[in-house]
Amino acid sequence: MPDVFLSPPAPGGPVVVIPTYNESGTIGAVVEQVLGLDGRFCVLVVDDGSPDGTGDLVDALRRRHPARVGLLRRAGKLGLGTAYLDGFRHARDAGFAFICEMDADFSHNPDDLPRLVDACRPAEDGGRGADVAIGSRYIDGLRVLNWPLGRLVLSYGAGVYTRAITRLPLQDVTAGFKCFRREVLAAIDFSRVRSNGYSFQIEMNYRAWTLGFEIVEVPIVFTERSEGESKMSGAIVREAMRKVWELRARALVGKL
């Protein structure tokens, strides 16, 4: 089927980009909960050819909510980073004012989305005036449920490692629950984004920060997925370790 995209139903509306691969157990409920927040939120799912029928489930939701659900089907498992970039590109070019990202497995609570969007609204509209809002697991104490100790140490250690090398002033550098103002994604040259695993989150934060955008962290509770399989792997960790040094080196020589 052709890709089905979206346009903002109203000025200033937010869209949530959700990448999927074999998320049929949760994606329907996640999308429905986002749509139930209020009439502002749209959803764009980027599916990497899931063999479990995730794309077909989303297409059924799209037919029920044609003005608020979009679907981008990709040919195969092409990676988290490129999935987000493809979704961001459409959302940015379509004119959505606020572009969010989140996981498809309820590790991020959709009910927290309005707080992220509000953090990016101008102060005169009751917001904090930030350019990027991160749903942070570490900004206000430790807020992670059901993670094994090893995974927690790995995640927290990634933050220490990244801050030491890049000076990025964030507690949760690898968080995948965010809201960007459209202007941020318009300023970042997607063709220069080289990360494709979880280091993608670090790279997007670093690029936004070095461009002078304000990033704030909003405390959330992260709950480890209860269905499906984690996409974390040793290769993803190794990529992240390399990419942090690469980002810093390129920034130092003016070739970020």
Explain the meaning of each model-derived region:
Residues R74-D93, F98, P110-Y198, R225-A235, ...:
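Acceptor/aglycone-binding surface of glycosyltransferases and processive sugar-polymer synthases
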Residues D47-D56, F106:
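A conserved acidic beta->alpha catalytic loop
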Residues M1-Q33:
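N-proximal low-complexity "stem/linker" segments adjacent to membrane-targeting elements
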Residues I18, R40-S50, L72-R73, M102:
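Short beta-strand/loop segment that forms part of the nucleotide-sugar
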